[in-house]
Each structure stands twice: as C-alpha cells, then as structure tokens.
Amino acid sequence: MTYRPATDGPDLASLTLGVEEEFLLLDAETGESMPVAARVLDGLSGVAHAQSRREFRHSMVEMVTPVLSDLAELRRHLVALRTAAADAAEAAGARLVAVGATPVNETHRTVPDEPRYHAMSRRFGPVAHDPAVCGCHVHVGLPDRELAVQVCNHLRPWLPVVQAITANSPLHDGQDTGHASWRAMQLERWPSIGPTPYFDSAADYDATVADLIKAGIMLDAGMVYWYVRPSAAYPTVEIRVGDVCPTVDDTVLVAGLVRALVATVAADVHDGARAPRIRGCLLSAAHWRAAHDGLDGDLVDLRTGRARPAWDLVDDLFALVTPALERQGDRAYVRDQLARVRAEGTGAVRQRRILDRSACDVRAVLDHLAAQTRPAPV
C-alpha cells in the first residue's frame, strides 16, 4: 500500500517525544532484588509521583517523562526523575539500578496484586516469572496512525543498530552471559515480543492484533510488545527495542537518534517511498547479532544482508539522520555523545570492564551501575 497523506503531514522538525525508563530495586550488599516498589512509589511526591508507574515486579519501578519538545528539556526531566526515584529507593533500603536484566539471582518473582498481571501469570506460567528485565521506551509523536504504521515498516532495518547502542545487560545469575543484551534473549520466550512484522496499513495492523488476541497469544492489545509499534495508549510511535540505559546522557542520545530517525523515515513515507520487505528470519538474526555483539563486533546490514563492523552502521545511521538532527538542533549533542560511547563503550562494555578489573566481583559492577544510574549533583 502507498501512503496517501490527508494533509501536508506533520511538522517533522518539531516532533514531540517522551521516554519511559524501567529500573530494578536491588539490595546494596547482595545485589538481590528487593520487593519494595510500593514503598518507593509512596515515597515519591509531586511531579515525580505523578510520573511514576508500577511495573510487573515488586522489585521494579518505571519513571515516565511528560511529552517534551527538545533534548535539553528531556535531560532535565530525566535527571529529576532518576534523582527522586534513587532517593526514594534509598529511603526504602534499596538501590535504584538502570540495567537491562537482573544481574544476580532473583528470589522475589511474584507479580503485583493486579488482575491483569495475575491473568498474564496464569496464562504464560513460568515465563511470567523469569528474572526481571528493564527497557527504555521512546515515544515520538505521530498523530496520523496510518503514517505511524508505515513509519514502523521503515524503521525495521535500523532497529538492530539502536538495540546494539543500548546493550546494557551482559550478566545473568552473577555470570557473564557472552551476550551484550541478555534482556533480549530472555524476552524471546514471550510470544508477542520481537521484530515488528511488516503491515500494509493500519487496518492490516489492527486485524493482525485482533487475530492474535482471538488465538490466545495475547490477552489484549496492550500485550503488543514488538520492537516498534503504534502506541496503544498515545498518538505516538513507540520504540521498545532497547535496554534501559545506564546514564541520563545515554538515554538522551538514544532518544535524539530515534526521533531524528522517525522524522527521516516519516518524510520518506510522505514522499511515497516504500519500506523494504525484509525476510523475517534475516530480521530476527540481525536482532540476535545486535543482542550478542552489541557494538563490539559486526552487525547485519539489512540493506544488503551482509555483516559489517557495528560502528560502520552507527556511522551510516548518523549520516542518514543528520539533516533531521540539524533541523531539530540536536546534531552536536548526538555527535558528541556517540563519540563518548565509542570511547567508553556501551553499558555492557562498561560492566565487563569493571568485572575484569575487580576479579569478577559482581558487587563492584552493581556499585558502578548504581553510581551511573543516579545523576551527578548539578
């Protein structure tokens, strides 16, 4: 289907954005999960309380920014929300930790006492009780739902690159898994998580979701956990592929790249460009490679189907979105933050560096993660 806009289209230079960050609540000594989410949420006040959410574990919280227009504003909100949540966690005897997967054994795996969570637990059994995982979800405003579905199609070739940039979960049960994002591996056990299928239209998308619900694969449309989707709750495209980022600047970098990428491909859709129909097996393999290697090895260039050095594809992505970044005033910030990640490594690389330096002391990694999670005082 060729997208035919009803209007001149959205102002692609000023797309709004918002970010959801999920965090673990861990014991400072053992690193084990602590089921104190209710106390942490009760300890928040004002804007932070209004922007907090209960999650799928008693040992998790989610902080959600409001709808925003620029990256500087986003950074200020993320700093404030992380600081408030870290303070509330400490008051509850825990530490707020931004990491994609539970790094040590999780003993508390019960879901909160909410009907929907209990229904998921009954339907999916042990999968619903896997160790907790945390993601970073970026929303970009696109009120035209038909356009949003086509944008999802166009984003698919680039999402493994975004996934690799965010990789921040190499540890599981106190051991290095050999994967940069163990979260991605763990989530594959759910039937409605993974690369987003190609859809011809919004009607095609809705019919597919309805069929999956009727087939018992999902409880409701809220269980569409594909890596990118038209949001079920907001007039946005929601990119869900990434691990939660270790630092505020890592999160803002990803949000800036994603918004510019959405603006770039939305312009292509508006001009009549068709998204490539990538074979599902190749798309899944590209995401596996991103989760395994992060930015330390090769990624699959889905434009050619061949492996290329990961940073070459990051450079290609940056070049692709540079015009959008310039229109949004974000080019210098994103360029500088990519240079920092190139020098320091992804969150997974940073964790492994601490693990090597500390003779495999996982507590040293947890100290590092907690320090990275809490923004430095201004």
UniProtKB/Swiss-Prot annotation:
Keyword Hydrolase among record annotations: no
Keyword tags: ATP-binding, Ligase, Nucleotide-binding
Catalysis: reaction(s): L-cysteine + L-glutamate + ATP = gamma-L-glutamyl-L-cysteine + ADP + phosphate + H(+)
GO annotation terms (biological process): modified amino acid biosynthetic process
Superkingdom per UniProt: Bacteria
Pfam families (alphabetical): GCS2
EC top class, as a word: ligase
EC nos: 6.3.2.2
Molecular function as annotated in GO: ATP binding; glutamate-cysteine ligase activity
InterPro entries in alphabetical order: GCL_type2/YbdK_subfam, GCS2, Gln_synth/guanido_kin_cat_dom, YbdK
Family statement drawn from the similarity comment of this UniProt entry: Belongs to the glutamate--cysteine ligase type 2 family. YbdK subfamily.
HAMAP family: Glu_cys_ligase_2 (MF_01609)
NCBIfam families hit by this protein: gshA_cyan_rel, PRK13517.1-1
Function: ATP-dependent carboxylate-amine ligase which exhibits weak glutamate--cysteine ligase activity.
Name of the protein in its database record: Putative glutamate--cysteine ligase 2
Organism: Salinispora arenicola (strain CNS-205)
Top-level taxonomy: Bacteria, Bacillati, Actinomycetota, Actinomycetes, Micromonosporales
